[in-house]
Amino acid sequence: TPTDTWKLCAVVLEFALAVLCGAIVHSYTGSRLRAFLTYAILAIYPTVVANGSLWNINCIYYVILFFLGLYLYSRGNALLGTGSILAGLLIAVFRVRSWWMTLDVAYPVSLNRGWPNFYEIIGKNAFVELYDKVSLLILAGMILTGIYWFADKKVKVTKDIVLRLFLFAAILVPYFAPYMPAWAGYTADVAALIYFMRWPKRFYLPMLHLIVSYSAYAYAINGETKLPMVVFSVLLLAMLTNVGVDLYHAAVKGE
């Protein structure tokens, strides 16, 4: 894609995101080595580079606000952290809606626009009009149920709980929301790396999620992948379950 001002600013922000995520890792682990490794990896992360530097999609404009919010949470500033994340969500919704409006489709014929979401498993071309209307309500119901459970159990929201919630939400939302584009996993790509730096036993999460994202990009560009997209959808479901179980155990134990 042509290099313009938006693209150049996005590239600068991508490096800023790498520095910010390094600071987040240092805040969580106290390890300068892990913080530097996080920066070094994100500076060459394939899907991050492809999103801005090559493809000019520039999700970084709202994604960096998500991670700024996470950093503020890790430093004990919940109010500013929440505000930063909400600002990122508003920009993300606007960007995705604008992208939908540019598509030359009179009415959606598929619940998938590149990201291997849940509808790959149940049939992305079946009952489109039905799922189109209720899928967001189902997603909202899941989120509200989680909030109610946390409130009912009086779970103490620690730094680690916030990080687990962050990654869980980053995988959950694009997985159950319809019409998600190929770059819908951008936030979870980065969050999974931070998750691994905090809990090294989960080293496979960033690796697997990066494979899914890269395959989604390949499918969007070439119209095909080495494996059926449903395989990546099942893989995402397994990762979502893994992080969800981690979150549940941490909440029960109060970690």
Feature map (PLM): residue ranges:
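Loop-to-helix entry region of an early transmembrane alpha helix in multi-pass inner-membrane enzymes
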Residues: 2-19, 36, 52-53, 128-138
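Membrane-embedded helix bundles of polyisoprenyl
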Residues: 11, 22, 34-73, 82-88, ...
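Alpha-helical transmembrane segments of multi-pass membrane proteins
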Residues: 12-15, 60-70, 166, 186, ...
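Membrane-interface helix caps and helix-loop-helix hairpins in membrane proteins
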Residues: 48-58, 175-180, 221-226
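Aromatic/glycine/proline-enriched transmembrane-helix motif characteristic
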Residues: 104-176, 245, 251
